[in-house]
């Protein structure tokens, strides 16, 4: 993983955009399964992707806090550095949240001790704010403080960035996650304590050619990319379809319907969807997800997950998301995944939220552009 830092130290190329490579790692779900701990985790921690998005509807928004983050299915990571001289951290680039945080050397939790920890005393540019920060998880609260320092993302140097330093991380299971922290790429309205997100500081400091970023996710361990300040046409074919952001908090859009076997099966009266790089699955209301699972032939196992017969995948139907009148089919090869034990799992997940979360399963099929200048999302068929 740390060898990735060399790749991340790329210069902004002549086309005026900056690329940061991502690595696809093993999900915590699979690590816990291999260690025989998944059943225990699911018994003791209510896992609900929908709790990550408490503010998806502005009419019920009262207090803006950092959204809940579920780490069970995060799988794409990149390397950034903080401080002078730089200290490297592996982070999830998460369009479903807006704060940056990493572990602090002041944290004695096992989860911190098993990851890279930021040492403020070793950075000549670090400034303490005296401010506290609490980030809520399905497994408990992450407590920390807020510091200010230089944050470098690929060749982009943000010299005055507020970020969270965790002093306590909840739950023994955080020991096993493959990333050190989170870098949120959502709108500023989601950020805890009014902290300006990293992307907004990049824009404010005129570091980007354009006020947008784009994401390509590969199924392979290497090859994924976040592109800051532009669009890389080598990652997609055909034209870009643009969809307006319906609520400027998450990267939230309006979806028309969901079709399986030419039948409208969910979201029949229209619904809201969030394009989220920090969730690997596609999640939606439980009744709709159950209908999709039934339509594609998935069966529930003892963990509450849904599995399919691996030999049937090529015959399984596409799940088609209709957005702005355009159909976006996701084939069975994209929405199923072998779990390493000879079983193929469905990547559709129940959620308590009355909205859809189009995570990495969807983004792997459609190159995604997050255009803040025009408050819109662009989708194009990924290579």
UniProtKB/Swiss-Prot annotation:
Residues linked to a glycan: 132, 204, 309, 350
Domain of life: Eukaryota
Matching Pfam families: A1_Propeptide, Asp
Any one biological process term the GO annotation gives: digestion
Disulphide-bridged cysteine pairs: 107-112, 267-271, 310-344
E.C. designation(s): 3.4.23.-
Keywords linked to the UniProt accession: Aspartyl protease, Digestion, Disulfide bond, Glycoprotein, Hydrolase, Protease, Signal
Signal peptide coordinates: 1-16
Protein name per the record: Embryonic pepsinogen
Species this protein is from: Gallus gallus (Chicken)
